[in-house]
């Protein structure tokens, strides 16, 4: 959720730090992007339908997600979703996706 908030607020330095931490912790960056895609899709569903039952958002963060979904214009969430979808295609066969992920997230922040 944090990375979506910094993309929306146009803070390009934050995604770099988040991705670097995930990388240093030895976590799978491709899996992170897949999970991010699912999360942004759920935010779009929430924004469009206002029905939290159509999402897989955990109850403990639902209130924050509702705020993000209602305060963010749907075109902006769709732009983020489109960028993440494109990123998923690009990293499919990438051996070291860190640089590609960082660059795509910077672009999303500065759009």
Give residue ranges: language-model regions.
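Extended, largely alpha-helical regulatory/partner-binding modules appended to the mid-to-C-terminal parts
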Residues: 1-111
């Amino acid at each position: 959720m944090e990375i979506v908030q910094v993309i929306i607020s146009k803070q390009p330095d934050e995604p770099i730090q988040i991705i670097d931490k995930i990388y240093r912790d030895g976590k799978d960056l491709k899996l992170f992007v897949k999970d991010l895609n699912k999360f942004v899709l759920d935010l779009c569903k929430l924004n469009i339908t206002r029905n939290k039952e159509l999402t897989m958002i955990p109850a403990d963060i639902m209130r924050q997600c509702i705020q993000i979904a209602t305060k963010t214009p749907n075109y902006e969430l769709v732009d983020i979703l489109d960028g993440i979808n494109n990123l998923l295609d690009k990293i499919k066969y990438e051996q070291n996706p860190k640089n590609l992920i960082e660059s795509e997230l910077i672009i999303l922040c500065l759009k």
